[in-house]
């Protein structure tokens, strides 16, 4: 630490590094915890912000992104913050129009329909400059955090981004995106490469701006079986990690732990553990002990309480957390949900989850 109390890049010195130490596989006094979508509509104060009304314009405002990022930390003793943004800012930066439709979610008025549509996408090298507003939000938020906890940056993985760009929004089947994989494999690989080439400088830029960890969301992994996943998702997941780490070294930036969260991708846990990430995120469909058997002791696991468990009583939440912690054990583990928080969840129950993790994980280490 410098004499003025500032760490590298002039940011305030980090006071709670429990999350980072767990991510790197080091011993911790308790199990760190954060929640996917911890900045969100379940908080009354979030619903009063501009983000609740005009989502993507909020994403483009560093000040407007900073506030919802900090809101959950004012309520709960979380061990990490995650920047308020969206995975779909990358397709936007590639030149696609994306709107947020109330009650429906993201919508692409002109999705990719033909191979020649790829020619309309911007050069992936310009994406990072188009997303400078995200970097500004990260720097501002890192300053405002004042070293309280680490700040996580994130992006969507190539396959997941491709699904939105081809489907035109969410889908229960991803039939159009998978149709591309079967009918246009070469064009699919071309699109996935474009996305990978856009993601790498974007993620490196987040670290340069102040992000202390990175999470890659492969939210639609479950729509691919083992064969399609190994062909169209896993190679690009690996390449993102490899290239980000190499570029950080080239830029003289310190390495940061990287997390891969492939929802419903339990069929590929062993491969994901060897994909170059320090942490593998789990959804609630995989048993902790089975997951540990698959990944071994070389990576940290993150997850994996069913988000709907937070609809239970606070007492039952405590029991479920205790069971989860017992199953994962105290080493190489970060507590989280198996997916994001839902808008109708009770903040008190989120607090009960966080408190239970801290309480039971300390007891676990005493025994």
Curated annotation (Swiss-Prot):
Keywords: Acetylation, Cytoplasm, Decarboxylase, Heme biosynthesis, Lyase, Porphyrin biosynthesis. Its main location: cytoplasm. One of its GO terms (biological process) is protoporphyrinogen IX biosynthetic process. It comes from the Eukaryota. The record marks 86 as: Transition state stabilizer. Coproporphyrinogen I binds at residues 37, 39, 41, 50, 86, 164, 219, 339. NCBIfam families: hemE. Belongs to the uroporphyrinogen decarboxylase family. This is Uroporphyrinogen decarboxylase. It comes from Pongo abelii (Sumatran orangutan).
């Amino acid at each position: 630490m410098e004499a003025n109390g500032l760490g590298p890049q002039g940011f305030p010195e980090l006071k709670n590094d429990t999350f980072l130490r767990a991510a790197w596989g080091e011993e911790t006094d308790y199990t760190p915890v954060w929640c996917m979508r911890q900045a969100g509509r379940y908080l009354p104060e979030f619903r009063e912000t501009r983000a609740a009304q005009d989502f993507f314009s909020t994403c483009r405002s560093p000040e407007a992104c900073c506030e919802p990022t900090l809101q959950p930390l004012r309520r709960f003793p979380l061990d990490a913050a995650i920047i308020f943004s969206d995975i779909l800012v990358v397709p936007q930066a590639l030149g696609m129009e994306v709107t947020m439709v109330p009650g429906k979610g993201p919508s692409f008025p002109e999705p990719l329909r033909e191979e020649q549509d790829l020619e309309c996408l911007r050069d992936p090298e310009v994406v990072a400059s188009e997303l400078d507003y995200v970097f500004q939000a990260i720097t501002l938020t890192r300053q405002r955090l004042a070293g309280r906890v680490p700040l996580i940056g994130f992006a969507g993985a190539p396959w997941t981004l491709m699904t939105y760009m081809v489907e035109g929004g969410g889908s229960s089947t991803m039939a159009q995106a998978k149709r591309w994989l079967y009918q246009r494999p070469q064009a699919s690989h071309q699109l996935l490469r474009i996305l990978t080439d856009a993601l790498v400088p974007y993620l490196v830029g987040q670290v340069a701006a102040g992000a202390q960890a990175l999470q890659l969301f492969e939210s639609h992994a479950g729509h691919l079986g083992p064969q399609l996943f190994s062909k169209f998702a896993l190679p690009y997941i690996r390449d993102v990690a490899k290239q980000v780490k190499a570029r950080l070294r080239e830029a003289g930036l310190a390495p940061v732990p990287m997390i891969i969260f492939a929802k419903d991708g339990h069929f590929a846990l062993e491969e994901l553990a060897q994909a170059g990430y320090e942490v593998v995120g789990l959804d609630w469909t995989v048993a902790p002990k089975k997951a540990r058997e698959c990944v071994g002791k070389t990576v940290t696991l993150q997850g994996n309480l069913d988000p709907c468990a937070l609809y239970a009583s606070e007492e039952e939440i405590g029991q479920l957390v205790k069971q989860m912690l017992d199953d994962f054990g105290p080493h190489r583990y970060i507590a989280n949900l198996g997916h994001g928080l839902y808008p109708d969840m009770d903040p008190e129950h989120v607090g009960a989850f966080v408190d239970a993790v801290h309480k039971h994980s300390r007891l676990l280490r005493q025994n």
